[in-house]
A protein has these predicted regions:
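Short alpha-helical interface elements
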Residues: 43-44, 48, 68-72, 99, ...
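Terminal, low-structured helical/coil segments at or just beyond the last alpha-helical repeat
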Residues: 236-268
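Soluble small-group transferase modules, centered on the S-adenosyl donor enzyme superfamily
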Residues: 3-10, 32, 61, 83-239, ...
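The AdoMet/dcAdoMet-binding core of the Class I SAM-like
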Residues: 1-71, 75-77, 195, 211, ...
């Protein structure tokens, strides 16, 4: 038996089109060295020109400084980086390459149509259309770089994450990590409008956001579409529906925040 790092080390440079790394938690001994600068640099050498590395990163069980460290280490490795969320926003997926990443609905659709296995795997996580995939997009590289500025790198020599992250193992850090990651980013920064080429595509993207109950982003996309086609009947019909859904969400949120439960089960 051998481990993944040594297996990759033994492969010839430039062998792979895509490498996906989803090891267990990054603080585990024997796993932590799959999240270091040296390992990601090794992986980059094994990719073909234009190859892509996909990296799972968790949002829970470590604080935002640990998250900043992991993201900065990855962005130090790859010139082009995109960031996506997973189911229920519990984790992140980093996508890195030395070539520009072609993130468009058409390109995603081509890959889904070309490989039925890929389409099935995506459908298993509620991504049945290219637009569903795009709703997982979080931020582009410029926002990532703002978030990680000044963060310490995770290296084979310091193993920072292995020794730091366990201190937050039993803390609920996911929501705070998401908030700090997106701090300073406008909602527009988290919506990939440039990935759809026309108004019908924008309408499809808006509808995909509603499947995630994200009516704020759906409205933002429809508003941008309306600027291009102000007389579009579909936009005219759906905009007030999405507005009503968003108001209902906000009202429910206010109601939840206004109700507290005491230890004896009473509310006030």
């Amino acid at each position: 038996a051998n481990d993944g790092r040594n297996h990759l080390f033994l492969q010839p440079d430039g062998r792979y089109d895509v490498i996906i790394s989803e090891p267990p938690n990054p603080w585990l001994t024997g796993v932590s060295n799959l999240f270091t600068r040296e390992f990601w640099a090794l992986g980059k050498r094994k990719l073909k020109p234009g190859g892509v590395w996909g990296q799972w990163v968790q949002m829970y069980g470590m604080d935002h400084e640990d998250l900043r460290t992991l993201l900065r280490t990855f962005t130090e490795t790859y010139k082009h980086v995109l960031l996506f969320s997973t189911i229920e926003d519990a984790d992140l997926v980093l996508v890195g390459s030395d070539s520009p990443l072609d993130l468009t609905a058409d390109r995603i659709g081509e890959m889904m149509n070309r490989d039925a296995a890929v389409a099935k795997d995506l459908a298993d996580v509620d991504c049945e259309t290219p637009e569903d995939v795009l709703t997982r997009y979080l931020v582009a590289q410029d926002k990532i770089l703002q978030f990680v500025e000044g963060a310490e790198l995770n290296t084979d020599d310091n193993m920072r994450i292995e020794y730091s992250a366990p201190r937050h193992l039993h803390e609920d850090t996911a929501d705070e990590n998401f908030a700090k990651l997106l701090k300073g980013a406008e909602v527009r920064d988290t919506v990939p409008l440039e990935t759809v080429k026309d108004v019908p595509g924008m309408i499809d993207l808006a509808e995909a956001y509603t499947r995630r109950d994200d009516y704020l982003k759906a409205l933002l996309v429809l508003k941008a579409a309306a600027e291009l086609e102000p007389d579009n009947e579909v936009i005219f019909e759906r905009y007030p529906i999405y507005q009503r859904k968003l108001r209902e969400q906000l009202e429910d949120l206010e109601e939840d925040e206004g109700t507290t439960e005491d230890d004896d089960g009473t509310t006030e």
